[in-house]
Amino acid sequence: MLGYFAAIIFFGVLTAPLLFWAAQGLAAQGILPVLATFDFESFFHRALLLGALLFIWPFLRWLRIKSARDLGLARNRHWLRDLAIGFLLSALPVICCEIVLVQTGVYSMRDTWMWVAVGKVTLTAAVVPLIEESLFRGLFLGVLLRGLRRWPAVVLSAAIFSIIHFLKAPDQTTTSVQWNSGFVSLAHAFDQFGEPLLVLGGFTTLFVIGLILADARLLTQSLWLPIGLHAGWILASSVFAKIARRELLALPWLGKSMLIGLVPLAVCLVSWALLRVWLRHAPPRET
C-alpha cells in the first residue's frame, strides 16, 4: 500500500502544474471561464485524486483482488434506503447545530445567497462521496482487513483518511506556478500540524468521521450507508458556508467550517449514536 501512495503523490506533484496550465488556457479562450477561479492547490488535490483512480487497477491486480467480495463487500438490496438514511443521519444533526449557531450570533445569514456556489457544492456532495468511499472504505479498509483485525484496520483507515484530508498547504502558498510547484505544495502541506488548536479541532474531527464511516461500512458490508453519511456532511456544511457568515472564530470549539472543531465533533458523535440505534432496530438485511 505504501507503494500505491508513493505513486499517487509522485503523479500528483508532476501533473498538477499541467492541469493548472491547461485549465488557465481553456479559461483564456472563453471555454469554462470558471476554471480561472480555482487556485493551484485545488488542482494539486485533483491531481492526487486522479492518480489514485488511475493506479487502482494495477494495485488490485497486484493484490489479486478480483471482486468486491475479496474486499469484504456484499451486494446490498437496500442500497437506496441506506443511502437516504445515511444522508439524514448526518445532515439533520448538522442543520440543527447550524440553526443554534445562527440564533446565538456565532453565524449570521448573508443578505444575498450565492446560488451558483450552492449548485457547485451540491454537485460536489453528489460526486465526492462516491469516489472517496470507494477508495477509503472500499479499497483501503478492505485491503487492511485482509491483514489486520477489525478495529486496528478501522483505526488505521480512519487515520489515513484524516491525515490526507488535513494535509493542506496554506492559502497563497503558490502564487506563481512552476514545474516544481507540486513539490512546494507538498512540502507546505504539513504546516497545519504546527498549530495545536487546529490539530485538536480539525484533525480529531476528521479522524472520528473516518471511524464512523468505517463502522457503517462494516456493519452493512456495503458502501451505500457511508456514502449517504458522507454526502450529508458535505452538503449540510458546505451549503451553510455559502448562505451564512461566521461572526467569530473560536478554536478549538469551532473552526472555519462546520466540520472543524469540538462542536462539530460532538455533532458527529450524535450521528454515530443515531446510526447505531437505527441499525439495531432496522429490519434484517438480505444480501
Go through each PLM region and give its residues:
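N-terminal, membrane-interfacial amphipathic/helix-forming hydrophobic leader that caps
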Residues: 1-68, 72-75, 79-80, 91, ...
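Hydrophobic alpha-helical segments and helix pairs
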Residues: 102-140
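Hydrophobic transmembrane alpha-helices
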Residues: 124, 128, 141-145, 210-217, ...
